[in-house]
Structures are given as C-alpha cells and as structure tokens.
Amino acid sequence: MNYKVLKNGELLRVYSCKVYPKPYNSTEHMEYVMFNVDDREEIVIESETEIKSAVIRPLSAGISFEISFGKIILSVDRPVKLSVEINGSSNNNLMIFAYKEEFIGPTHNYIKITQDEYKTGTLLIEKDNTTVYIEEGATLYGNIIAKNCNNITICGRGRVCMERYTYEMRKNFARSIDIINCKNVTIKGIIIDDSNDWSMRITGCDDVNISDVKIFGCRGNSDGIDICGSRNVTVSDIFTRVWDDSFVVKALDTGNCENIIFKNSVLWNDFARPMEVGVELRADKVRNIKFENIDIIHSDTGYPLMGIHHGDHAEVSDIVFDNIRIEDTPGAQLFDIRIADSVWNRDNKMGDIRNITFSNIKYLGTDNNDILLSNSRIEGFSEEHNIRNVNFHNININGKYALTPKELGLNVYEFVDGISVTADNLKNERTVLESEIVMQDDFKPDNGFYKGTVKVILHNKSDVAMNGMAAFAISPKNTEKEQSFEYNIDPNESQSYEFNLKLQAGKYVFYLKNNKNEIENTFLYSELPMIVSENINDCPKYQFVNYYNTKCAEVRIAVKDNELIIMNDSEKTTEFLLYTA
C-alpha cells in the first residue's frame, strides 16, 4: 500500500480496488479508507510518494487541509466521499468514505456475511422480507440476484466483488447486483467492486431506494447504476469510479420508466458518460427523471457528460439536470441530445423528446484545462420524431453565464424546436465582444520546432466602447505562456492582435481568457505533426506534455532503414509503452 491513514491518531485499514486508468485495457489499484464520523475527526495521510501538493475533490465539499512535514492533515465532521490527489495527478489517489452510522436492515429472513468471511457464487433472494447484511471486511465473491420479491434489503459496509469471474463467465456472472420485478427494495452502504458487466441493474421494479453505495468498475461495460423500466426510484449519496456510464436510465420492455431521481453523488468516469438516458428506451413513456446536486470530478475521454440518446419508440419527457458541478473533464461535451438509430435499439418506430431542462450547471475546469474542447449537440430524427423545448438556465462556464447557444458551445441541428438559453439577473442584450482566432500563416518547421502567427480579432457590434484586459492562452501548456493584451474598441469597430509562437509538435487548443466575461467563448484547434529525420542526433528533443500539464522525459525520435529509433539523453534507465494505430 502507498498510503497510511490515521484518524485521531488511530491507524485505519486501507483497502484496495482495481480501476481503469489509461492506457486502454490496463488496470491499476486505487486505495481507500472508510470510517465512522461522530464529531470533528482529524485525519492524517502519509504517502510513500513524496507529497509536494494536493487537491481534495469534489471542490464543493470545501475541505481545507495543510501539508506539514510531508503529511496531509485535514478534518472531517460529516459524511463525505472525497478523492485526495497528490502532486497534480489523479493517478495514485486516495479515496475517503466517512459515514455517520451503519444500517443493518430488518432482521426477518436475515442473511449475514461476517467480517473476514468470504463467500463465492450467486446469492439468490427468493423470499419476501429478506435482508442480506455484509459486514465491513466481509466479501461476497460473486453476485446477488433477486426476482419477484417484495420488501428486500441489501446493506452493510462489505463488498460484492467479481474479480474471480472472467469475461467468458458472463452468462452466469454478469451484473454484481441484479434486481428484477421486485417492490420495496433498499440497497444501502455496500461496496461493489470489479463487476463483470453493469454493477447494479434495477429492472421492472417499483419503490426502490439506493443510498451510500460505493462502486468501482474497471472492465468494459461496468456501468454504475442502471435503472431499467422501473418506477419511483431514488438513488442518493453514491460514489462511482467506473469504466462505462455511471448513472443510466433505460427501458427494456418492463414497462414505463418514471419518477426516478439521482442526487447528492460524486461521479468519476474513466471512459464513458457520467449521466445518461438511453440508448435502449423500449417503453411508451420515459418521464420525470431528475439528476440533481452531483459532482463530476473526472471524465476525460470526450464522451458527453449529460446525454439523452434515443432510438426506440418511447416518448421521453420532463428530464431535469440541476445543480451539476463539473471539474476535470478535458475534451468532453457538456450536453448531447439525439434521436438516432443505433445497434442497441430494437423498435421499428422512433420516438420523440420533450421538455428537457439543464439548470445551474457549473463548469469549473482545472488550472491547465479551463475550456470546453467539444461542442454540445442537439439533433432530431425527422419532422415526426423531433426534439422540442430544451431549456438551458444558469449555465456557468469558467465564471461566465451563457446567454446564447454559441456561448454555450451548442450546435443545434435539424428537427429541433424551442431552445432557450437564459440566466438569472442577466438579459440577452448583454454587451459581448465577438471573437475570432485564426492562423495568420501556416506554421513552418524551424530546427525541430514550429514557428507561426495566430491572430485574434475582436468585434464590437454594440453602441458603447469596450475596454479591458484579456489573455491569449494555449492548452496544453508547452513552450509558450499566456500572453496578456489590452483592448479598447469603439462601437462598431474591430481590433486584431497577433501572437508569434514557437511550438513543439503536438495537438493544441488556442483560446482567450477574460476576467470581465465580455468576450464570447471561442477556440481554435491545431495539430502540428512530428518532425522525423534519419540522424537521431540531429532531431530535436521532444518534451511530452499532456492536458493535465504532466511532463515526461525528453526524447529524440528518428526513422532509419524502416526502424523507429527513440532515444533519451538521460543516463537513467527509461521505460515506456508504445501504442500504434
């Protein structure tokens, strides 16, 4: 274990689970601790890796800390789910799960798995009024299935883990928790670890309450919680770190899906979507679905953060995303709503989408990643199967409220009607400078680098003069720093500003920063190919920098006699993994 954690001077047990970091098809271990919080508890964290800096997510938790003599010291006085991340990276983080009390459930038909006890196989619930209690430290290696039962409870602080079951065993060991055609279901407190498919599926059920569940999924299709064709379901106080989607609503021929709420949760997606309605929506109605008070702390592969994807016959309506905070999500779309055919759909007839609300959404970004790299999208299917009445209210992107689809980074395509973008106490006639970022000249190779000029053009189409300070910025940060400039533009006039750049090969986004939030959001994407020659000693040194501003050792790259040569000038042994596509 990398971490040692003390609560009020008492050593805590540190657990470990598999997660999917990067690159593709790999796994690593993430460490976590759990403890009861009665009052203000002092937590001291030590790491085998030297702690130079730290961040504690979600930022909305407002947890203050100090680093003293290489240790992180913080206080916790309430139930929280926190990611402690050191030295500017989310790799090698520590999760903290603090809870108030343990729920042991009703004691009729009581199945108890005690501490340090390990059971294997499928635990099948076949009777009404059954409770499965998994004590902290206990593990069920397998899955839990309940069919056609009323009043069932699954609770405790222990694990349901499928690490012993391979992909080929999915026929019998797919989902860790599978609840089918049941009523009055409570699932509370447990940990789901390394599911072979969706971590938890609720299908054809009524009156379900899921709370304080921690889900770790490192495999393909390891969704967090899928609510399928069910009614009156509350999902709250959840943590997910999964390969696939975190919170999902579907309909799989088990009736309408309605009155579903996901709330007060922390989501970390290593590959796919944090919140999704779809794609399979085989029901007459999918309605009254709400996602509220949710923190997305990481999601970095470009998938939509909030999506509705529809290819079946359902009428999808009254979907709300409210009070969502977004932190580290480089490349992701904020919103994606589409009606389209897909490989997952079976209905011959298409449906429609009505009355969708996104409100109080706050995109925070990170120090090195504070812009949206992908535009959002809304697209219907036909005149008959269309999308109507989509409202965006109080959408804050890096401190600036969007008042137009363009400011929102929203592309609106065919068969869409009734889009509104508003914000409290702001009017659509707010004065904003229109902006352009263009290549003045093509970037030319120069001694292993590229040199070129980027032009910024600001247009003042208002009837008042506008002035202030702005900055031309590049992500990822590489050889160039932000360049500040002053603007003073008369009504109906434009000004241009040129920036001479020297860049290494790589992919870049050029964008503008403005503290007054009066310059519209715009960015320019550019890709500069690597320069390769035969003589490696003549090649430039490449410093690899990713979107997190993580830097690797410098290397030289050459191609000679159909061989790829990679050289590091350092005398130290260098390990690397090469991927080709």
Regions found by a protein language model. Name each.
Residues 41, 450-456, 562-564:
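Structural beta-strand segments of beta-rich domains
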Residues 98-115, 527-547:
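Low-complexity, Pro/Ser/Thr- and charge-rich linker/hinge segments at domain boundaries
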Residues 35-37, 442-450, 556-559:
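Short, solvent-exposed loop/linker segments at the N-terminal edge
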Residues 1-438, 463-464, 487-490:
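Extracellular/periplasmic carbohydrate-active domains that bind, remodel
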Residues 503-543:
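Terminal connector regions
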Residues 458-462, 566-570:
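Asparagine-centered strand-capping/turn motif at beta-strand->loop junctions
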Residues 464-477, 571-580:
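Short acidic, flexible loop segments centered on an aromatic residue
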Residues 478-505, 581:
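Intrinsically disordered, low-complexity Pro/Gly/Ser/Thr-rich segments with frequent PxxP/GP/PP motifs
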